[in-house]
Curated annotation (Swiss-Prot):
Organism: Heterometrus petersii (Asian forest scorpion)
Name of the protein this chain belongs to: Potassium channel toxin kappa-KTx 3.1
Gene Ontology annotations for the cellular component aspect, listed alphabetically: extracellular region
Signal peptide residues on this chain, from the entry's feature table: 1-26
Propeptide stretches in the record: 27-36
Tissue expression summary: Expressed by the venom gland.
Keyword 4Fe-4S carried by entry: no
Keywords: Disulfide bond, Ion channel impairing toxin, Neurotoxin, Potassium channel impairing toxin, Secreted, Signal, Toxin, Voltage-gated potassium channel impairing toxin
Domain notes per entry: Has the structural arrangement of two alpha-helices stabilized by disulfide bonds (CSalpha/alpha 2(S-S)).
Disulphide connectivity of cysteines: C43-C61, C47-C57
Family: Belongs to the short scorpion toxin superfamily. Potassium channel inhibitor kappa-KTx family. Kappa-KTx 3 subfamily.
Keyword Transit peptide assigned: no
Length: 64
């Protein structure tokens, strides 16, 4: 009985650490995507001020 309880406790701790890692990783991916969007928008805005060629700026900055 005691070993079953210990095994269950260890399993719960492992599962909780996996869930915690997954949520932190998801936040990291989300913030990385947000930073990429901010960079693309900034690049596009600066390019438009310089060249005013929308098609070229979209190509240069990778904006879809």
């Amino acid at each position: 009985m005691k070993s079953t309880l210990m095994t269950a406790s260890v399993l719960i701790l492992v599962l909780l650490s996996i869930v915690d890692y997954a949520s932190v990783y998801a936040e990291f991916i989300d913030s990385e995507i947000s930073l990429e969007r901010q960079w693309i928008n900034a690049c596009f805005n600066v390019c438009m001020k310089i060249s005013s060629d929308k098609k070229y700026c979209k190509y240069l900055c990778g904006k879809n």
